[in-house]
Amino acid sequence: AFDGACLLGDWVEATEIKAWDQVQYQLEINGQVRQAGDTSLLIFSIAELLLDISQSFSLQPGDVVMTGTPAGVGALQPNDQLKMTLKGQSQDFVWSTCVKA
C-alpha cells in the first residue's frame, strides 16, 4: 500500500444493474483501452463469489469486494488521464480522473 492507492469512485447501486453476469467494463488511459472485461467471463459468478466470501466474513452494506483485474494493468504516470466505463443493461456509468503530478 502507498499514499493514494486504491482510490474508489462514486458508487453504482446494486439495483442499477439488472444482470450482473452481463456487465462489460473498460479502462482507458490517455485515450487508449488498457483493460476490458466482461462479467460473463469470470470463473465464478458474482453471486458465487459473494456466497463464498460470506461463509468466512460478515458482509455489510457498503462493503467493497476486490477480486483482481483483467490483463493490461500497469504503472501510471503523472498527468495520465483515466476513464472507466461500466456498461449496464439500461445505461453506462462513466468515471474520469487524472493522476496528480
Language-model regions, residue ranges each:
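Catalytic-pocket segment enriched in acidic/His residues
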Residues: 1-101
